[in-house]
């Protein structure tokens, strides 16, 4: 099974401020039943940003996956039991974890805020 991870850089200019999201490992091949961690780091001057994971499935449908901030995270109904996030505040990281991976998880995943 191939999980395609979207590679995105999002820049928001507010005067001289610049916010950025960086995803690494743009394409990953993952065996069904294993675990995958989709990496996302962000850079912002805001102390409690709203962070999101979205995905675009092979049929081009767009889906919300996960939301998080400094105190909580919440996933879409389909994420229950298999999807989670690792929000590491000190590293400004918001990684998506899928375990166990299923074929229906194949999609392009995007991290944003």
Swiss-Prot record:
Transmembrane segments: none annotated. This is T cell receptor delta variable 3. GO terms for biological process: adaptive immune response; immune response; innate immune response. It comes from Homo sapiens. The lineage of its organism: Eukaryota, Metazoa, Chordata, Craniata, Vertebrata. PROSITE patterns: IG_LIKE. InterPro entries: Ig-like_dom (IPR007110), Ig-like_dom_sf (IPR036179), Ig-like_fold (IPR013783), Ig_V-set (IPR013106), TCR_variable_region (IPR051287). Disulfide bonds join 40-111. It comes from the Eukaryota. Keywords: Adaptive immunity, Cell membrane, Disulfide bond, Immunity, Immunoglobulin domain, Innate immunity, Membrane, Receptor, Signal, T cell receptor. Residues 19-113 form the Ig-like domain. Residues 1-18 form the signal peptide. The gene is TRDV3. Gamma-delta TR is a heterodimer composed of a gamma and delta chain; disulfide-linked. The gamma-delta TR is associated with the transmembrane signaling CD3 coreceptor proteins following the stoichiometry: a single gamma-delta TR heterodimer associates with one CD3D-CD3E heterodimer, one CD3G-CD3E heterodimer and one CD247 homodimer forming a stable octameric structure. Upon activation, gamma-delta TR complex associates with FCER1G to initiate intracellular signaling. GO terms for cellular component: immunoglobulin complex; T cell receptor complex. The keyword Disulfide bond applies. The keyword Transmembrane does not apply. V region of the variable domain of T cell receptor (TR) delta chain that participates in the antigen recognition. Gamma-delta TRs recognize a variety of self and foreign non-peptide antigens frequently expressed at the epithelial boundaries between the host and external environment, including endogenous lipids presented by MH-like protein CD1D and phosphoantigens presented by butyrophilin-like molecule BTN3A1. Upon antigen recognition induces rapid, innate-like immune responses involved in pathogen clearance and tissue repair. It is found in: Cell membrane.
């Amino acid at each position: 099974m191939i999980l395609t991870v979207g590679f995105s850089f999002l820049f928001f200019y507010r005067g001289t401020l610049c916010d950025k999201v960086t995803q690494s490992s743009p394409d990953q091949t993952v065996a069904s039943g294993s675990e995958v961690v989709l990496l996302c780091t962000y850079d912002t001057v805001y102390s409690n940003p709203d962070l999101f994971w979205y995905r675009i499935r092979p049929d081009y449908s767009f889906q919300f996956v996960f939301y998080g901030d400094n105190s909580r995270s919440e996933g879409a109904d389909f994420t229950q039991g298999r999807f989670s996030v690792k929000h590491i505040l000190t590293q400004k990281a918001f990684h998506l974890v899928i375990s166990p991976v299923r074929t229906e998880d194949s999609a392009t995943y995007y991290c944003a805020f």
